[in-house]
Amino acid sequence: MNTDKKSDLLSVLSVANVMEHIRYSVAACQTDSSNPIDRRGMRANTERILSMIDSAVAGAAPFLPVRLIVFPEFAHSAPVFPTAAELHEKLAITIPNEHTERLQQKAREHDVYIQSGSMLESDPKYPGHVFNATCLIGPSGILYKYRKVNTWIPYEVHTSPHDLPDYNEPLFPVADTPIGRLGCAICYDWLFPEAMRQLAMNGAEILIRVSAYMDPWGATDPMDWWTVINRARAIENMAYVVASNQGASLKFYPPYSWPGGSQVVDFDGRLLAQASPGPGERIVVAPVDISALRHERESRRGHHMLSHLRSEAYPTYKAHQYPPSLSNEPPSYETNNTRIDEAKKHFAQRSKTDIS
């Protein structure tokens, strides 16, 4: 073979490697575990999560292998105490920790990526504050940490990182991995299309939902906000959605019941897989085709909302709606309600001004 032909062949092979088709299965796992009231109690939940990872991998092994496994909000720990001080004292942990280390070992064992269930996080940089956090963990370790931006107020008393005046970390991180570009948001975040749009604009191809979505808004008629939101966000952002919902029974997580219904949705809003509604452990698996998604994003001209967005047409986003925190103190039920009242007054005044 002459030098020119050999060079051409190497070029073709190089392009083929770059264009390698990325297709695999994802698993949305929902848990039904007791609610720990201390750090020691978290270990049993983590052990069950590790076992479910083994099951997800084994179940898909004869078919399209699983490469991404997602767990729900509160899978490790939940805000069972009414104040940030109690959560900080009894449940909050720093990241990384023994749980993320165990997950990394499992990710390395199976060559998978794991979106952890959420855990209550403390950080010495922000004394007294507690975050609702989840990590994307791969064989090499933690790829990003996401802290819930839109906390479920007034009840949730963990801190939104957005509210800390000296916070300088990315609010919506995205990880570029061999299985695609992944980004995550937690539960109530998903009712704000702006959050998912920011992840997509940051490059996310799979939008991961770590959630504890309760009745009556959950995964069943007549409301079924769960499915409506998941499908809408997939369509709006031309992205896959892997949504893991809490499947705990009422006795574990009162005062709400948890409808499960974990889902996988494709970038056109098609429901690829869904767990049956109702409490209980479930693992739902579906294929995702990142190469097909990239082709659509590159070639599609119609219904390409990411590129058609006229962001400057929406000046409402230049001003605050929900008021910024005026204190560096952790939130409480009372201060959350005060800020909600202020935000509602601001909205009413602003609406009248805009109409006139």
Where are the regions that the model predicts?
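C-terminal beta-strand edge segments of enzyme domains
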Residues: N2, D8-L9, E236, N245-S356
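N-terminal active-site segment of His-dependent metallophosphoesterases
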Residues: K6-L68, I208
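Alpha-helical scaffolding within the catalytic cores
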Residues: L9-L13, H99, P170, W226-I229
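Short, glycine-anchored, charge-dense loop/turn motifs used at functional sites
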Residues: V26, G128, N132-Y144, G261-A273
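Residue-level recognition of beta-strand->loop/alpha-helix junctions
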Residues: Q30-D32, P72, R147, V210-S211, ...
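Cys-nucleophile CN-hydrolase/nitrilase-fold catalytic domain and related Cys-dependent amidase chemistry
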Residues: R43-L50, D54-P139, L143-K145, P154, ...
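CN hydrolase (nitrilase-like) catalytic-core segments centered on the catalytic cysteine
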Residues: E98-I114, R181, C187-V284
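Active-site catalytic loop in hydrolytic enzyme cores
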Residues: S122-I206, V210-A232, E298
